[in-house]
Every structure is written in C-alpha cells, then in structure tokens.
C-alpha cells in the first residue's frame, strides 16, 4: 500500500499563503536572517521550521516536542533532496564571478523550493492542535522548542531573540 503524502497537489499549487507572507515580512527585519542562518549553519536548525514555529505561535498555538518532530518529518525528505543541494550549489558558485548569472537562477530555484517546503508546513498546520493553549508566550516557547529539538538540548533562554521580537510585531 502506498502511503499518501501529508500534503496534496492543491496545497503545493498555492504556495503564497499566510505563512509565506509572514516569513517574508519577519525574515526581512533586522537581525532575523543572520540569526536564523547562524542557527542553521552551527546547529542544523531548519530555517523554514523555525519560521513555522514562530508563525504558528502568533496564532497562540504552542507546540510540543512531538509536534515539532512531526513537522520535521513532513519536510525532511524535500529539504535533504531538493533544498540543501540547491543551497550547496549556490554557495559553491559564490567564489566565481563568472557564475553570477547561473548562481542567481539557482538562488531563485532554491527560494521556490523553500516556498514549497513552507507550503508543506502550512498544510500540516491544519492538523496541529495546541498542546497548551494557555502558555504565556507561544512564539518564544515554539522557537525555543524547535531549536531544542534540532540540537537535542533543553534551552532555558531565547534561542532566536530577533526572530521572536520580529514575530511579535503586528503587520504594518
């Protein structure tokens, strides 16, 4: 029996969703990109998963370790087989100025692949129910939990303070 994917084609055909728009707005704020990329490079944290945890926290939904592990399973194959190879290819071209045009095209494909990854997480969000609807700060809780799961650690302080601060800001 073939296991059905946790998303359907309709979800993937509509990657411009609330989560994607949140990510574009938040990621562009001061310090957020550097913070997220540092967590990715030093600790293997998936930036889209980190943004997902912050976004779902804006809806007062708190995630537990099992929720984050389930979300990770939704995207791990796509991230490993598509997003990361594109990222590696783009980074390899950085040193060669003659590759600037090709590098720009690869970067555009990488962003599209990340948008599809976010569409998978967005579709998954409908299945998540808050583990603790009364948690004081769902954004900080979820972001810290995401980093803790990725690093197999327990964090007592905010792992990504710029992201948490940016996610708390209302749309302008």
Regions found by a protein language model. Give the residues of each.
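Long, acidic, intrinsically disordered low-complexity segments
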Residues: 1-12, 129
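Acidic, glycine/proline-rich low-complexity segments that act as flexible tails and inter-domain linkers
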Residues: 2-3, 15-30, 167-172
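N-terminal interaction modules that seed assembly of large macromolecular complexes
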Residues: 32-69
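Residue-level detector of well-ordered alpha-helical segments, enriched
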Residues: 35, 45-51, 82-85, 102-105, ...
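Short alpha-helix boundary/capping elements
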Residues: 44-48, 56-61, 79, 111-117, ...
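Short secondary-structure subsegments characteristic of cysteine-rich extracellular domains
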Residues: 63-85
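A charged, amphipathic interaction segment
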Residues: 91-170
């Amino acid at each position: 029996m073939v296991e059905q994917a946790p998303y359907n084609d309709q979800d993937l055909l509509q990657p411009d969703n609330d989560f994607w728009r949140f990510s574009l707005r938040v990621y562009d704020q001061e310090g957020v990109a550097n913070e997220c990329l540092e967590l990715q490079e030093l600790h293997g944290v998936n930036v889209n998963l980190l943004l997902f945890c912050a976004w779902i926290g804006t809806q007062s939904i708190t995630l537990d370790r099992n929720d984050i592990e389930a979300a990770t399973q939704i995207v791990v194959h796509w991230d490993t087989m598509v997003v990361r190879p594109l990222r590696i290819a783009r980074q390899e071209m950085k040193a060669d100025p003659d590759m600037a045009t090709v590098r720009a095209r690869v970067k555009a494909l990488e962003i599209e692949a990340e948008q599809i990854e976010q569409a998978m997480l967005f579709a998954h969000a409908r299945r998540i129910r808050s583990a603790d609807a009364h948690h004081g700060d769902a954004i900080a809780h979820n972001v810290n939990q995401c980093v803790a799961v990725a690093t197999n650690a327990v964090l007592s302080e905010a792992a990504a303070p710029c992201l948490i601060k940016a996610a708390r800001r209302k749309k302008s």
